[in-house]
From Swiss-Prot:
Residues 1398-1412 have a biased composition (Acidic residues). Many Plasmodium falciparum strains have two highly similar paralogous genes, CLAG3.1 and CLAG3.2, that are mutually exclusively expressed. Analysis of blood specimens from 20 Plasmodium falciparum-infected symptomatic patients indicates that parasites predominantly express CLAG3.2 in natural malaria infections. CLAG3.1 is preferentially expressed in cultured parasites. CLAG3.1/CLAG3.2 expression patterns can change under different environment conditions. Disulfide bonds join 335-363, 409-415, 519-547, 523-544, 1352-1355. Residues 1371-1413 are annotated as: Disordered. It comes from Plasmodium falciparum. GO terms for cellular component: cytoplasmic vesicle; host cell plasma membrane; membrane; rhoptry; symbiont-containing vacuole membrane. It is a single-pass membrane protein; Peripheral membrane protein. Component of the RhopH complex. RhopH complex is at least composed of CLAG3.1/CLAG3.2, RhopH2 and RhopH3 with a 1:1:1 subunit stoichiometry. CLAG3.1/CLAG3.2 mediates subunit association through independent contacts with RhopH2 and RhopH3, which do not directly interact with one another. Interacts with RhopH2. Interacts with RhopH3. This is Cytoadherence-linked asexual protein 3.2.
Length: 1421
């Protein structure tokens, strides 16, 4: 018990621990996608309020404008920027004539370019004000435009970025310096506000004159264009006007304005007039803009935040420190929303449910910034999956930091990442810092000088991974409240580029512009307010101010020079030849746009930001945040095209695809080649490597009868048949719960049922199925190489003269073994007559007619026995590069290609590549080499190993490169094209759906079907139509090939970082492939019963009419009235009986007969429930000692076998029984037969319904009928088995004793073998070891039966004897006397005690000369 004085201490520590947990819980739940809160119990309103109340509003404001650490770091960065501007190689801006009129030279330093040159350039100083830097930025842009060329492009970008950063720093230092001098928070905020209200040169007149008149004329002009029917492209006319602008020079493209400072000042003025000055000067930088919008909120609501304190206030840095979902909760508190975001639902859904019409523009902008900062964070984390380490969005911020430094520095402690081997290995760069064995941990990873140095020195040359590491380093600092990271973020391009993520809607640029026009129309009709004339932070900015200001900012011109909007539109439509901004954005990385054209002028990002805020579809009627979330809602809908929609009817898709391919213009493939990079064709060739030659597989498959069987063994079956049988066996085993348990030992299945009963769980090894097939394939090849003639050629002769075919066999199996984990098998139809021109025409016509009849009356399942099966591997890195480039080409040319036409154009391109491999193929189609694909070099066996591998690849690529490569390409392309894959991957990552992936009947679960049925996605979306032929038409190997389709999909999903979908395909490779094959076989036969089903349907309709009206609809079915008394009233058809439609007992007698047969067929089909191997094999186990005189049964596959017909009979008995009882149920099944089963979408959902409802009723029926008898049979079988084991054990324990006693009493020297002592012991020992014992004990043994539970593991057991009967040993072996003993001795002999008592008796050397039989008897006694 705790003493009294210790109690307060314990309570104190308990409270500390509780507080620690509460503080950590705020970061516990990361919000994926759209910030879904996964753990509502942790972040309850009570817990969150308790935590947030700890933060004082004034302290939070002080952290922004009274923070000494922030002030110090900003000052340090300012000095670093000023120093770098002085030492910059780009000595601009130059001091020219008229420059002094633009800026105050006294606040700048003048520097000569060289000592011998009179030209001077100016650099700002610490005394330069914010307005001075604004003018300085105008000068730099003016002169950069004039001198621009590609050689100095990176230098210009770098200078523009750091000057913009310097301007931001100057603005951030204004309230910090003011508070430091006056120690007054409000006056510091007012000092910041004065920057935008007390402009030095305030213009009295607007650049566009009267605003009302301007917009009135604009709307009249827009209305005129829309009403003019002669104008075809109205959207382009609205943007470009009457002037047709051609592609401009690079400097016109790269900069938003021309080299005119006055025009730049006019842009500043126009944004200032609409209250957008803050956005104009800062740009859409996520950190900087958010910082000042929060300060603007602080000034506007100063009384509520800091005097009354009835609303919570948080600094921008503190908001970013929270988890993704909690950031919105904090924002709701700051914006005084009545409904604070505490829901588990997505932020979009909860935001749109509440009336947000009164929300201020500042809160709308913060909503936008937080939403895309969350997306930026997730994008950075997602991109790490392309590297050697993975992060995930659910990680707490501390763990993200630790995980990052553990990866970069091999230690969670901070280090300078630029000095680590992980960073250096991305490229060979010269390191200007001294080499160190261990990363320097004395200097912080967020050191301002080091990060700025490497940014200026190396950033422009960084690749994707290094740029990612730099931004991820800064992100970890922001998430963990590091002020230095907060300051460093000001110059990182990724925080500007995040605006690009908002252009995800698949709409043309002109359509987005029309939304902006609609916003202006709505504002002009609703109100006519006067503009503010400045960007006073106290002013309320409305949506109308935003729309009008954005329009003017984007459309202002100077001297007939195109506006920003026109430049950007021309760049898209004529430069890049695309119509959608999203097509451009999808090809860019959001954290490294430093290398694209937008980085030449940061105002491009400002233009995109303002244009995005005002171009949402519903912006005219909703505020910015509502319009943004409504736009995202549209993006969430599945992009259902003919390529991506897996429910699209496959016959229509097939014929449409073939039609598009046939009508593709001849020059379209040439155009695609021109759009590709020079080395892409070579990459395409290297994307696949063929390993298992088709002729190699055919030797074990189609030509298996020609192979010599091993001595004493039957001839082997075709390899594809063996593989198909293994899949069928797995399917038969799965319902009994033995799915992939002990896959390496197929004979252990008999014991599994007992393990289940004994609760010894055996976990399934579902991802190991390929190893089973490997053993079967290797066994088939080994048997081939064991043939006598193969041994003579391959093993006993010089390999130099070996047959080409044998060498090809050996190379194929070696390549398969060496690349086992990566090998995939595809197949094609093997129709030999099709490839031989000598085939008579009538035979070809006959085959075609037979195929047509076979397909029309069902489907084409099992039409061919064998297929052409070959193995290959995918070079994932190269293929990913190829697909990324082609996908980018498609996005940039959607005006030329549709998704289907682009796919078929790529297929034709692959056909061209395939033709380049055909140099060694003969021209005549009748050639046997071409028919069986033995088109390798004539001297193939004499080549070295590397050359032979190339021959195999070229041989297979000459026929199957296009089909195989296109299958892999379409998988990746259609996945990237769909906007549903991200959500699908997240759905299968949820705990409730993880079990679907490992389920053996996932195809019958609602989640599997609702989330897209990966089986249908593979067959109807991810793969081309021709890929369905082998998985349907082949009798042997179709399931094996389909499982490899799943494995290819798994690899493709893994390449795109969809880990959950990758695992789903891997785990469902067997179960779903088996289901598909079985479904096709059942569908084929089911459709053959169409005439019979139709006949009974017509008869049923007639009887239904008789039940309802009293007379038959068709008189043929009216029973004769010869003896009406023998027929029930309802059956005679003369009386109405409407209730018989639901249930009738009139045919109960007939139904009972069918129920009887249904019951007995269930006994046969459901025997696996209690007998894992079936009832027959279970009985045979009792006669294993009798050799079975029968032939080996042919392995079963998915076809019409005995079980199939038993199931068919079972189905007939079920139908005849229950259809006769209830006509309503019969009609329900008719609807399924005629409609549901013929539409894949309906059939999949009906399968789920059938499982949970109809099958449930059938299971309950079986439980009270056939299952009872099966259980009784199982119990009886076990009792018989136990009784048999009992007899065996008794006999096994008595047998050695009987033999010894027989030896003792019935010894015949003439017959007895004269065995020596040790031979006899070994003989008895072996006998004891081999009998069946299993350490069983007998219960309720009588006194005379106790010996049954006694065992001796080291010596034989003898009968209980009287001591008087013991034998005595004498020197004469023929004289044996017995002596009576009155007392019994134990039958168990303790050999250890015996050795201790008399070691002489156990000495073999001493007794060596004694006869063996006498020595043995003496040893027993």
């Amino acid at each position: 018990m705790v003493s009294f004085f210790k109690t307060p201490i314990i309570i104190f520590f308990f409270l500390l621990c509780l507080n620690e947990k509460v503080l950590c819980s705020i970061n516990e739940n990361e919000n994926l996608g759209e910030n879904k809160n996964e753990n509502a119990n942790v972040n309850t309103p009570e817990n969150l309020n308790k935590l947030l109340n700890e933060y004082d509003n004034i302290e939070q404001l002080k952290s922004m404008i009274g923070n000494d650490e922030l002030h110090k770091n900003l000052t340090i960065l300012e000095k670093l920027i000023l120093e770098s501007l002085e030492k910059d190689k780009l000595k601009y801006p130059l001091l020219k004539q008229g420059t002094e009129q633009l800026i105050d030279i006294s606040k700048f330093n003048k520097k000569n370019i060289t000592d011998a040159d009179d030209e001077t350039y100016i650099i700002p100083t610490v005394q330069s004000s914010f307005h001075d830097i604004v003018k300085y930025e105008h000068l730099i842009k003016e002169q950069s435009i004039e001198i621009y060329n590609s050689d100095i492009s990176d230098k210009i970008k770098k200078k523009i970025f750091i000057v913009r950063t310097l301007k931001t720093i100057k603005l951030m230092l204004i309230p910090l310096n003011s508070y430091k001098q006056n120690n007054d928070l409000k006056s510091a905020l007012e000092e910041l506000n004065n920057v935008f209200t007390n402009k030095e040169a305030q213009k009295e007149s607007s650049p566009i004159g009267d605003h009302g008149t301007f917009f009135r004329k604009l709307l009249t002009h827009v209305r005129t264009i829309k009403e003019n029917e002669d104008i075809e492209n109205k959207g382009e006319t609205l943007i470009l006007g009457d002037n047709k602008i051609d592609v401009m020079n690079s400097n016109d493209f790269f900069f938003t304005t021309n080299s005119n400072v006055k025009f730049m000042e006019n842009l500043d003025d126009i944004t200032n007039e609409y209250g957008l000055g803050l956005i104009n000067h800062l740009g859409p930088h996520l950190i900087a803009l958010g910082h000042f919008v929060v300060l603007k909120l602080a000034l506007k609501n100063y009384k509520n935040y800091f005097e009354a304190k009835n609303i919570k206030f948080f600094s921008w840095q503190k908001i970013l420190e929270f988890s993704m979902s909690d950031r919105f909760k904090v924002l709701d508190m700051m914006c005084n929303h009545e409904s604070v975001y505490y829901s588990e639902k997505k932020r979009r859904k909860t935001y749109l449910k509440v009336d947000r019409s009164s929300t201020s523009m500042e809160c709308n902008i913060l909503e936008y910034l937080l939403h895309y900062f969350n997306k930026y964070q997730l994008e950075i984390i997602k991109t790490t999956q392309d590297t050697d380490f993975d992060l995930h969005g659910m990680m707490e911020h501390k763990y993200i930091k630790d995980y990052f430094f553990s990866f970069m520095c091999n230690d969670p402690k901070e280090c300078i990442i630029y000095h680590t081997n992980q960073f250096k290995k991305e490229a060979n760069e010269e390191n200007t810092f001294p080499e160190q064995e261990e990363p320097n941990r004395q200097i912080s990873a967020f050191n301002l000088y080091l990060n700025y140095y490497y940014f200026m020195k190396r950033y422009s040359s960084y690749g994707t991974k290094k740029t990612l590491y730099v931004h991820l380093l800064n992100l970890t600092g922001l998430l963990n409240h590091d002020t230095r990271a907060y300051v460093t973020s000001l110059y990182l391009p990724g925080y500007y580029n995040a605006v690009e993520m908002s252009f995800t809607d698949d709409k043309e640029f002109s359509t987005l512009f029309e939304s902006l026009i609609q916003c202006i129309e709505k504002c002009h009709s609703d109100q006519a307010r006067q503009i503010s004339k400045d960007s006073n932070l106290l002013n309320n900015i409305t949506k109308c101010d935003l729309c009008k200001g954005a329009f003017l900012y984007a459309n202002m011109k100077f001297d007939e020079v195109p506006s920003m909007l026109q430049k950007f539109y021309v760049y898209l439509t004529k430069g890049l030849k695309i119509q959608k901004v999203s097509s451009l954005i999808k090809t860019l990385d959001i954290y490294q746009d430093y290398s694209n054209f937008l980085s030449h002028d940061i105002n491009w990002y400002t233009f995109l930001f303002l244009f995005r805020l005002t171009s949402f579809k519903e912006i005219a009627n909703k505020n910015v945040a509502e319009a943004m979330y409504l736009n995202i809602k549209d993006e969430d809908t599945f992009n259902k095209t003919i390529v991506t929609n897996y429910w699209y009817p496959s016959p229509i898709k097939k014929y449409y695809t073939l039609y598009v391919r046939k009508h593709i213009p001849n020059n379209l493939v040439d155009e695609l080649e021109k759009l590709m990079k020079s080395g892409t064709l070579e990459k395409m060739k290297k994307s696949l490597t063929f390993l298992v030659h088709v002729n190699s597989f055919l030797q074990l498959d189609f030509f298996h009868q020609l192979n010599e069987p091993p001595l004493g063994l039957p001839r082997s079956y075709p390899l594809s048949l063996v593989l198909e049988h293994k899949f069928k066996e797995w399917m038969d085993s799965s319902p009994a719960g033995f799915y992939f348990s002990n896959y390496q030992n197929p004979y252990i299945r008999k014991d599994l049922h007992d393990k289940v009963l004994s609760q010894k769980f055996e976990p399934p090894k579902m991802n190991q199925w390929n190893k089973v097939l490997k053993s079967l394939i290797e066994c088939a090849y080994d048997m081939y190489f064991e043939q006598r003639h193969v041994k003579n050629l391959y093993k006993y002769h010089n390999i130099y003269n070996i047959n080409n075919k044998l060498m090809l066999m050996r190379d194929s199996i070696d390549l398969y073994k060496n690349n086992f984990d990566d090998v995939l098998f595809f197949a094609d139809i093997f129709n030999m007559r099709k490839y031989m021109t000598a085939t008579p025409v009538y035979k070809k016509v006959k085959d075609r007619v037979y195929h047509t009849l076979h397909s029309i009356t069902g489907n084409s399942v099992n039409f061919y026995k064998y297929g052409i099966i070959y193995g290959f591997k995918v070079n994932k890195e190269i293929l990913k590069e190829v697909v990324d480039e082609l996908y980018s080409i498609y996005n940039f040319n959607t005006d030329i290609f549709t998704d289907t036409s682009f796919l078929q154009t790529v297929y034709l391109l692959f056909r061209r590549i395939e033709e380049t491999y055909r140099t060694q193929r003969r021209d005549d189609k009748i050639s046997v080499n071409n028919v069986f694909f033995m088109n390798v070099a004539n001297n193939y066996s004499k080549l070295n190993k590397e050359e032979r591998e190339i021959e195999i690849h070229n041989s297979m690529a000459s026929r199957y490169y296009a089909k195989t490569m296109f299958a892999a390409f379409q998988m990746l392309f259609s996945t990237m094209l769909s906007n549903n894959v991200d959500n699908l991957d997240k759905a299968y990552g949820l705990s409730e759906n993880i079990q679907v992936a490992t389920s053996t009947s996932a195809f019958l679960t609602f989640a599997y079907v609702y989330n897209g049925s990966i089986m249908d996605s593979v067959t109807n979306s991810l793969l081309p139509p021709y890929a369905k032929k082998p998985i349907t038409q082949l009798k042997y190997g179709k399931t094996f090939v389909f499982s490899n389709y799943f494995m290819l999909a798994s690899k493709m999903y893994d390449m795109l970082n969809y880990k959950n979908l990758s695992l789903l395909c891997e785990y469902q490779a067997v179960a779903s492939a088996n289901f598909y094959s079985a479904k096709k076989v059942g569908q084929f036969l089911g459709r053959k019963f169409l005439p019979i089903t139709t006949y009974f349907l017509v008869m049923r309709i007639s009887w239904t009419h008789a039940f309802t009206t009293g007379s038959h609809l068709i008189t043929y079915f009216d029973p004769p009235n010869t003896n009406p008394s023998t027929l029930p009233n309802c059956a005679s058809g003369k009386n109405k009986s409407p209730e018989s439609f639901f249930f009738t007992h009139a045919l109960a007698a007939e139904a009972s007969k069918y129920l009887f047969f249904y019951f007995f067929t269930n006994l046969y089909l459901d025997a696996y429930k209690s007998f894992p191997g079936g009832f027959g094999p279970a009985i045979k186990e009792q006669t294993q000692h009798v050799q079975e005189q029968t032939y080996e049964r042919k392995p079963s596959v998915h076809s019409f076998n005995r079980n199939f017909f038993m199931e068919l009979a079972n189905g007939f008995m079920y139908a005849f029984c229950f259809f006769a009882i209830s006509q309503m149920y019969a009609y329900f099944e008719n609807i399924n037969f005629y409609i549901t089963s013929n539409f894949r979408f309906l059939d999949r959902y009906y399968g789920v319904f059938n499982k949970y409802f109809i099958n449930y009723a059938i299971i309950k029926l079986k439980e009270i009928t056939s299952d009872l008898l099966i259980k009784y049979e199982r119990e009886a079988y076990l009792n018989m088995k136990k009784y048999g084991y009992l007899g065996e054990v008794i006999a096994a324990r008595l047998s050695p004793k009987d033999k010894i006693m027989n030896y003792l009493h019935e010894t015949n020297d003439d017959v007895m073998s004269n065995l020596r002592r040790y031979d006899m012991e070994n003989a008895f020992k072996n006998k004891m070891v081999t009998y069946v014992d299993d350490f069983a004990f007998f219960d309720d043994c009588g006194k005379n039966e106790q010996f049954l539970n006694e065992r001796c593991d080291y010596c034989p057991v003898i009968e209980e004897v009287e001591e008087t009967e013991l034998f005595t040993t004498t020197g004469d072996k023929n004289t044996n006397e017995t002596t009576e003993i009155k007392k019994q001795t134990s039958t168990y002999i303790d050999t250890e005690k015996m050795n201790e008592a008399d070691s002489a008796d156990s000495d073999d050397e001493k007794d060596f000369d004694t006869p063996d039989n006498e020595l043995m008897i003496a040893r027993f006694h």
